[in-house]
Design a protein with these regions (language model features):
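Gly/Pro/Ser/Thr-rich low-complexity, intrinsically disordered segments predominantly at protein N-termini
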Residues: 1-160
Length: 160
């Protein structure tokens, strides 16, 4: 099954899981919690506020050497969107890719995703832990702040 078939398959719509594929094309599902979704939404809102030169959006599918990975949030420049529009999945990574850790994720899994996204052209990889603390990475090191969106906060707070 290819990515477009997975997206179109009626039995796979409206699942309470995020779908990705592994390097062999097998479907991998990750459960989503409301806390995860709330953090994802706040990050998207903050990106829209602090990075007006592009578009922030959730659930960005990216073709990698290890299958299709779906970033929790991505930010793409106008130039990226002019090149790729709504391709599904994207053949390269948007400039900023954000993953929100959940109980089912390991740091090793996030490190692998980070490397896969950089190999596809990401400029920065951001990681949000379960408490909202942000870490920013380029392909060489951990950054004190994002170089692309320097006003982005180092902690995402929920309204409760």
């Amino acid at each position: 099954m290819n990515w477009q078939e997975i997206c179109a398959h009626p039995a796979l719509k409206d699942l309470p899981f995020k779908l990705e594929t592994n390097r062999w094309g097998h479907i991998v599902m990750s459960p989503a919690s409301n806390r995860h979704s709330l953090l994802q939404g706040e990050i998207q809102t903050l990106l829209r506020r602090h990075a007006p030169g592009g578009t922030a959006f959730p659930e960005c599918s990216i073709e990698t050497t290890a299958g299709v990975k779906v970033a929790d949030v991505a930010w793409a420049s106008r130039e990226f969107l002019a090149r790729h529009g709504a391709a599904n999945p994207y053949p390269e990574s948007p400039e900023i890719v954000v993953e929100v850790l959940s109980e089912s994720n390991s740091r090793a899994e996030m490190d692998e995703k980070k490397e896969l996204y950089f190999a596809r052209g990401a400029k920065e990889f951001w990681l949000c832990d379960t408490e909202g603390a942000m870490t920013f990475h380029n392909n060489h090191a951990v950054l004190a702040r994002s170089a692309l969106v320097p006003d982005f906060p180092d902690r995402v707070t929920l309204p409760f």
